Amino acid sequence: PVDGDWGDLLRSASRHIGWTKPVPAGRGRGLAFGMKSCVPATESSARIRLRVDGSVVAYVGTSEMGQGAFLSFAQLVGDWLGVDPANVEVVMADTDVVPFDTLTASSRSLVHMGNALQAAAEDVKRQLAARPHGRQQGDIIGVGSFAAPPDPRHPLGGRTPFFEAVATAVELSVDAETGHVEIHKLVHVTDAGKVINRSRSSGLDDGGVVMGLGLALSERLEYGDKGLANGSSLDYRIPTVADIPTDTTSRFQENGDGPGPHGSKGIAEGGVLAVAPAIAEALFQCTGLRFREIPFTPERIWRKTNGR
């Protein structure tokens, strides 16, 4: 489903970059939009155990790899069952004990596994309510699952449950003598539907933006006669803390229109999408030249600006 307000994303990014203000001498501004779909035709299942002592165990097939699924799931389950998230244990990934999950990828876990956990939590509450006076005589186990609605018109038998839509704006300058690009300000806006864990979500988007900076300005594989020539961390140029603009802002559009819990959508992977085209447009505004090949390295910029 194509949802959200894409125009509002662009307006928000342009407003916070100061698009209508005069551009300082020697600088250029760029604004770009990006969108990606979530992988279609996948399924997630979850199981929740409510123990007699009031603690909760949630079993999920999701793998935690820094995206914050562990914290988000504990927060959601605690909210649905009325318990402190600190009393929610999340058991992940061990296929000997957790229900089926198609994969951990494509920013899908919050929507797919989140909905499966919500169904499992509702199952727990139904069972608890059916007992006399709500008394619990033993552990209660609830199960739930979620799958994107099938659509036979699509070649893979399904459709994406949501899109990641983002807008990025930058302000930069170019050193005429070296071709070095300095980004003075960067604003990134994501349509999150509804943010579940704000601090973790901001960190995820910031990380995606930094990956986008590497894609745009420095990262490429160099091959020589003996194969890959820059295959080490010493030679492959990823962004460092010194490369990140000090004035970097990640913001969220929250319309509550996503298919996940509380109207949420998956985020973070989209952070990469619009950085390079925004920088390309800012380079054009700054130099009057179109750069159509990434990364925009100092050498490439110097050669083009000097007619080489």
Which sequence ranges carry the predicted segments?
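Alpha-helix N-cap/start motif
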Residues: 84-85, 291
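Extended, non-catalytic structural segments that build the interaction scaffolds
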Residues: 58-65, 255-275
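Generic long, charged, amphipathic alpha-helical segments
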Residues: 89-92, 240-264
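Cofactor-centric catalytic regions
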Residues: 1-81, 93-209, 215-243, 300-308
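C-terminal substrate/ligand-recognition segments
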Residues: 267-292
